[in-house]
């Protein structure tokens, strides 16, 4: 069975992590080739793309401009600053934050481009919600409602 067949099933909600990482040993040209293949697979299968990016923001932006995706692109574990976050949000990227985040980046993504995650860390997701709500100076319930709305891009209910 090929990858396309496997990811087309209802049990798969996204493609990823697709990555561009300047600290990785793989040459960037190869990383971009594989990344673009995964991005195109996400488009073909109508799935969001989960992205791992380390110090390759210009390459990532160039890839997005080349693909012109209709499906959401979500940057996993975003820890950049508010200026970078604002630039990425203006370009239509969603940002997912874990237990370590820059408060100005959170504000740049709030409300519509924000996701939260744990990435199998020792902190519970409830702790992430609590810390992010505090950083945004909003009630935790308001954050929960907005994240649920943002998650609806995955169309998990059909």
PLM ranges: what are they?
Residues 3-10, 101-110:
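Short amphipathic alpha-helices and their capping/turn segments at secondary-structure boundaries
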Residues 4-90, 138:
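Divalent metal-binding pocket/active-site signature
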Residues 12, 92-93, 112-114:
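Active-site regions of enzymes building and remodeling cell-envelope glycoconjugates
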Residues 40-44, 129-158:
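Mid-to-C-terminal alpha-helical segments outside catalytic/metal-binding sites
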Residues 50, 74, 94-96, 115-117:
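Structural detector of well-ordered beta-strand residues that form the stable sheet scaffold
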Residues 92-104:
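His/Asp/Glu-enriched short active-site or ligand-binding loop at hydrolase and phosphoryl-transfer sites
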Residues 109, 124-128, 147:
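Domain-scale detector for complete catalytic domains at protein termini or as standalone homologs
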Residues 112-124:
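Short acidic/histidine-rich active-site segments
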């Amino acid at each position: 069975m090929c990858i396309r067949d496997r990811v087309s099933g209802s049990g798969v909600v996204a493609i990823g992590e697709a990555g561009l990482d300047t600290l990785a040993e793989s040459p960037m040209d190869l990383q971009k080739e594989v990344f673009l293949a995964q991005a195109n697979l996400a488009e073909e299968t109508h799935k969001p793309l989960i992205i791992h990016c380390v110090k390759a923001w210009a390459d990532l932006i160039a890839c997005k401009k080349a693909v012109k995706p209709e499906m959401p692109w979500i940057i996993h574990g975003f820890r950049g600053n508010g200026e970078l976050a604002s630039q990425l949000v203006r370009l239509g990227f969603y940002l997912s934050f874990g237990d370590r985040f820059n408060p100005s980046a959170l504000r740049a993504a709030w409300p519509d481009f924000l996701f939260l995650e744990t990435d199998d860390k020792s902190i519970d997701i409830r702790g992430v919600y609590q810390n992010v709500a505090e950083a945004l100076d909003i009630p935790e319930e308001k954050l929960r409602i907005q994240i649920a709305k943002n998650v609806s891009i995955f169309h998990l209910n059909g």
